[in-house]
Curated annotation (Swiss-Prot):
InterPro entries (UniProt xref): Palmitoyltrfase_DHHC, PFA4/ZDH16/20/ERF2-like
Name of the molecule in the record: Palmitoyltransferase ZDHHC15B
TM helices/strands, residue ranges: 15-35, 51-71, 167-187, 205-228
Record-annotated DHHC domain positions: 123-173
Effect of loss of the gene: Morpholino knockdown has no effect on development till 18 hpf. At 24 hpf, the embryos exhibit abnormal brain development with indistinguishable boundaries among different regions in the forebrain and a slightly reduced size of diencephalon. A reduction in mature dopaminergic neurons is observed associated within learning and memory deficits.
General function of this protein: Palmitoyltransferase that catalyzes the addition of palmitate onto various protein substrates. Has no stringent fatty acid selectivity and in addition to palmitate can also transfer onto target proteins myristate from tetradecanoyl-CoA and stearate from octadecanoyl-CoA. May thereby regulate target proteins association and localization to membranes. In the nervous system, probably catalyzes the palmitoylation of synaptic proteins and is involved in the differentiation of dopaminergic neurons and the development of the diencephalon.
Ranges in the topological domain labelled Lumenal: 36-50, 188-204
Positions of the catalytic residues: C153 (s-palmitoyl cysteine intermediate)
GO cellular component, one term: postsynaptic density
Annotated catalysed reactions: L-cysteinyl-[protein] + hexadecanoyl-CoA = S-hexadecanoyl-L-cysteinyl-[protein] + CoA; L-cysteinyl-[protein] + tetradecanoyl-CoA = S-tetradecanoyl-L-cysteinyl-[protein] + CoA; L-cysteinyl-[protein] + octadecanoyl-CoA = S-octadecanoyl-L-cysteinyl-[protein] + CoA
Primary location recorded for the protein, binned into one broad class: Golgi
Length: 332
């Protein structure tokens, strides 16, 4: 027991190494750009002030989104998806697997659940003792079930899911903008140092490496950001792209794809003026999502999006009522 605790403690400590590396590179880039480029290399005051203003806007947005991606805790299923004491006792004492499955089916009929395991059974997490909502998965690193889990990202040392997916996307976008701005403004001075128009000194080293590091990070981020833009457009998570969710008629990668406009609003919210600001605006509460396979008139979550507001009582009641009838439809 003591050994396992020590190993988990070491794992938690080492898991911060990628974040420390990124933070160190960013802090160095701040010093190199502000002091070595703007204050040491640049001679034009107007150019210096302009570069500093734009740079600090990019730097603040990068830090803000990175902070939110790291420290926003992953959302977990609410109590209504956990087994009650009576159901848990009945489930654990039952030795017949087919009866255990039926117990979970009976409980799930009261919940807005449409997806199943590959075998067709109710998706149940033995570790968390919870019936998994649609798009929810257990993270072995965080040791909990995460709503609309996309992946566990070592570079933010956090699970990317429903609660912080918008922040993660903004982090990628502002990281690219940060790199592009640095590379585009440093390039002319890189050439001047390279051909010898500017004298050698500490600034030369920083300016040369600023360009290389900015370009290297931009290229890697460009592919990752492009991939996640495609996922958002299709309303898929990374896990769903590799293993499509299973519905009544089998696996369907486009099961949650309700159109580009609605897909974007699910992640970024209704108000476009808040799309590029790292504040939580995603629709719903992460437990249930509109389905493409149901007509809009039959899908209460798609036809009545105003019910997605975080109103615990009314939201749960409508979900219970609609979830039960719709679940029977998918199992028929």
């Amino acid at each position: 027991m003591a050994l396992s605790r020590a190993l988990r403690c070491c794992q938690r400590i080492f898991s911060w190494i990628p974040v420390i590396i990124i933070s160190s590179v960013v802090l160095w880039s701040y010093y190199a750009y502000v002091f070595e480029l703007c204050f040491v290399t640049l001679s034009n005051n107007l150019e210096r002030v302009t570069y500093l203003l734009i740079f600090h806007v990019c730097f603040i947005m990068f830090c803000w989104t990175y902070w939110k991606a790291i420290f926003t805790p992953p959302s977990t299923p609410t109590k209504k998806f956990h087994l009650s004491y009576t159901d848990k006792e009945r489930y654990e004492m039952e030795e017949r697997p087919e009866v255990q499955k039926q117990i979970l089916v009976d409980i799930a009929k009261k919940l807005p659940i449409f997806t199943r395991a590959q075998s067709g059974a109710i998706r149940f997490c033995d570790r968390c003792q919870v019936i998994k909502p649609d798009r929810c998965h257990h993270c072995s690193v965080c040791e909990t079930c995460v709503l609309k889990m996309d992946h566990h990202c070592p570079w933010v040392n956090n699970c990317v899911g429903f609660s912080n997916y918008k922040f993660f996307l903004l982090f990628l976008s502002y990281s690219m903008i940060y790199c592009v701005f640095i590379a585009s403004t440093v390039f002319q001075y890189f050439l001047k140092f390279w051909v010898g128009d500017l004298p050698n000194g500490p600034a030369k080293f920083h300016v040369l490496f600023l360009l290389f590091v900015a370009l290297m990070f931009f290229v890697s981020l460009m592919f990752l950001f492009g991939y996640h833009c495609w996922l958002v457009a299709k309303n898929r998570s990374t896990l769903e792209a590799f293993s499509p969710p299973v519905f009544q008629n089998g696996p369907d990668r486009n099961g949650f794809n309700v159109g580009l406009s609605k897909n974007l609003r699910q992640v970024f919210g209704e108000h476009k003026k808040l799309w590029f600001i790292p504040v939580f605006t995603s629709q719903g509460d992460g437990h249930y999502f509109p389905l493409r396979t149901l007509r809009e008139s039959e899908n209460p979550l798609l036809a009545n999006e105003e019910k997605w507001v975080e109103d615990g009582g009314s939201d749960e009641e409508s979900a219970d009522e609609n979830g039960s009838s719709l679940l029977i439809r998918t199992e028929s």
